[in-house]
Amino acid sequence: MAHYNQLNFVKVAANHIKSDWGNMKILEVGSYDVNGNIRALFQGSEYTGIDLCEGKGVDIVISGVDLALPDESFDLAISCESFEHNPTWYETFLNMYRMTKQGGALLFTCATTGRLEHGTQRTDKNDSPGTQDIGWDYYKNLKKSDFDAMDLNNLFTNYVFFTDDLSHDLYFLGIKN
């Protein structure tokens, strides 16, 4: 999924880390193109998009928690607007971390306080492709405090959370220790 504020965050964060992503390996968890995507921001990279169902932007059909590629496979691991639909978001985050190279970056955007529930049977399941197909009727607006149980100071040399009160998004960027 993509919306203006989220796209801007990804673009600014990615450019802050590295001005040229050519020849880099990038993983996107939740890559199904609902209404735009971030893949175009990383021209020349080796880009792998995963999601729960086939569709535009999806290279491999698998959940982020079940992806079992080798440790430190990617220079950048990204998830945009999917953690709020994922009952295993915590484990997915840690799996993305595992697959990110030391000195590489982990970046995510997700819904936070104030965003209306979407992508469930109670709303419009088309807002979260694939989740209903595998039995995930889940929605949670995540907050920075939801990550307190992780020892982020040990996992990352630097990290930052931002909250966008206009779009009701939580943004994260961390450099793997």
Task: Indicate residue ranges for each PLM-predicted region.
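Class I SAM-dependent methyltransferase Rossmann-like catalytic core
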Residues: M1-D20
